Amino acid sequence: MTTWNFVCLGLGSNLGNRHEYIKRAYESLKKAGIRNLKSSVILETKALLLEGSPKEWDLPYFNCVAIGETQLSPDELVKEIKMIENRLSRDSSLKWGPRSIDIDVLLYGDESYSCCSERCIIPHPRLLERPFLLSMMASLCPYRYFRLRGSPYDGKTFAELAAIYPLTEKDVLGSFAPTTQIMGIVNVTDDSISDTGLFLEAKRAAAHAERLFAEGASIIDLGAQATNPRVRDLGSVEQEWERLEPVLQILAESWKDAKQYPDVSIDTFRPEVIRRAIQVFPIRWINDVSGGSLEMAHLAKDLGLRLLINHSCSLPPRPDCVLSYEESPVTQMLRWGESQLETFAQIGLDTSWQVVFDPGIGFGKTPVQSMQLMEGVAKFKHILKCPVLIGHSRKSCLSLLGRFSSQDRDWETIGCSVALHNQGVDYLRVHQVEGNRRVLAAAAWSGMPV
């Protein structure tokens, strides 16, 4: 009978959407047969380069460590890893150069196991030269012993090694939760409740998008049509596009040569806006607040975009049009989600990743119903088997916790974010990116199942 062996992997990315590459690597590793996979927090660190390396290689890395179990031998595992790296656009021709994903086998088998083959060396030969790796390994397996015959560190636990080679403040540029990505909100409108008119001017909106990316958002959601309960007139396609186009043009110029960048999402229920946007900027997401019309779904399929389906009882939301009081809102949203996903699967969308479910906090839900929906994330993920996004930032349901203005609900937003993260939510759509990112990273320090 084939046995399951412990494995510890190091993952890194310093090109493109680094958080997304790491997420995709984890999905690929699970498909390769690694079970019980658990990730450390993600640490952003400076690139380690050889002397004389090109200046353009000096790009910060996202690094993390994962532990799990595999039935593959070390050589088989390395072979599988190389195939994953190739599928994720890894360029192996430049040693020490930038890469979309890098996966190394750090440890394998029981504590006494070591090997030195053409494919791999275990323990990893540069393990003790990387304090950030030791710190993350100590968070996942602190009492596992490091074994290397002849080494002065043979027989020491990773908890002790992390103390011998401590990670200092200057070593860490930032930290991120491994399982929850942040979508930053940019409202290019004059009637948004939270930031009325602040980013209506294109240059300010583009600068805000760049700031949110710098603060840790892996997705930027641009919306040029407000859909909050105060809106009475949803305007026209031309008005929406007049606001959105110059922002996309500025970002297209700003990010055209960027080596690291976020995905860009367009928050609209109008397919025509998406058709125009894709001509100006390589957007990756459609955020359809209407819940995903068939026309929008076909557009997502044809363009290879991700489709975020936001449930709403009406547009704009009306206080007299809400979910039933006779049944759990979670049950009602599951029924709607299953119906939508079945329809999208029939037209050819891959609902395991391409469709993202959003129960629509505040869109046709009372404050109590909205809070109940936030408690249902684990059930949504388990039953719908698709990614889940929650957009709770500064929403009126948080007034159940105190009388604060919408701009002053970030504390409550972050508190809910931690609870959502602990249920395994995939994406959080928020206004205040840095605070959410930092708190979620702290919540994930001891590791998260992936």
Curated annotation (Swiss-Prot):
Renumbered residue ranges of the record's region DHPS: 182-450
Q: What is its EC number?
A: 2.7.6.3, 2.5.1.15
Q: Where is this region: HPPK?
A: 1-166
Q: Which GO terms describe its cellular component?
A: cytosol
Top enzyme class:
transferase
Tell me which Pfam families the record gives: HPPK (PF01288), Pterin_bind (PF00809)
User: What are the entry keywords?
Assistant: ATP-binding, Folate biosynthesis, Kinase, Magnesium, Metal-binding, Multifunctional enzyme, Nucleotide-binding, Transferase
Q: Which CDD domains match?
A: DHPS (cd00739), HPPK (cd00483)
Locate the Pterin-binding domain: which residues? 180-441
| Names of required cofactors | Mg(2+)
- Reaction equations catalysed: 6-hydroxymethyl-7,8-dihydropterin + ATP = (7,8-dihydropterin-6-yl)methyl diphosphate + AMP + H(+); (7,8-dihydropterin-6-yl)methyl diphosphate + 4-aminobenzoate = 7,8-dihydropteroate + diphosphate
GO biological process terms held by the UniProt record: folic acid biosynthetic process; tetrahydrofolate biosynthetic process
Provide the binding site for Mg(2+): 187
Pathway assigned in UniProt: Cofactor biosynthesis; tetrahydrofolate biosynthesis; 2-amino-4-hydroxy-6-hydroxymethyl-7,8-dihydropteridine diphosphate from 7,8-dihydroneopterin triphosphate: step 4/4; Cofactor biosynthesis; tetrahydrofolate biosynthesis; 7,8-dihydrofolate from 2-amino-4-hydroxy-6-hydroxymethyl-7,8-dihydropteridine diphosphate and 4-aminobenzoate: step 1/2
Q: Report the GO molecular function annotations.
A: 2-amino-4-hydroxy-6-hydroxymethyldihydropteridine diphosphokinase activity; ATP binding; dihydropteroate synthase activity; kinase activity; metal ion binding
Q: Does the keyword Magnesium apply?
A: yes
Presence of the UniProt keyword ATP-binding in the record: yes
Gene3D superfamilies reported in the protein's UniProt record: 7,8-Dihydro-6-hydroxymethylpterin-pyrophosphokinase HPPK, Dihydropteroate synthase-like
What positions does the entry give for (7,8-dihydropterin-6-yl)methyl diphosphate binding? Answer: 227, 267, 287, 358, 395, 429-431
The UniProt family comment states: In the C-terminal section; belongs to the DHPS family.
The protein, known as: Folate synthesis bifunctional protein
Give the originating organism: Chlamydia muridarum (strain MoPn / Nigg)
The record's gene field reads folKP
